[in-house]
Amino acid sequence: MSPTQRSLALLRRQGALAAVVERWNSYAKVRQDLWRFGDILAVTAEGIVIIQACGTGDQARRLEKIKSEIVWPKARQWLKAGGKIQVWGWAIRGAQGKRKRSTLTITEVVEG
């Protein structure tokens, strides 16, 4: 199960309205995020949030991408309009030979 699939499943279990907003560009053969920083758009009880879903090992790199001079103006505009941005990092953890569990680390993107 991919990080995006895990995130969607969790959001829906929590009662959020959630949809994948990244798309496949068949010409370039790459996935393109919404505004270069969003995989999932969710409406939750706390408000609207764009989620970048990844493995925990990629969280720092995704945060750097969002804060880059190319992406940050769009992300900042989203934040100023009242939206939230979160990077959800998933890991599969557990001792060898034991049952593995998915763990989630959520990092909130804030201005500054």
Where on the chain are the PLM-derived regions?
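Catalytic phosphate/metal-binding cores of nucleic-acid and nucleotide-processing enzymes, i.e., regions
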Residues: 1-112
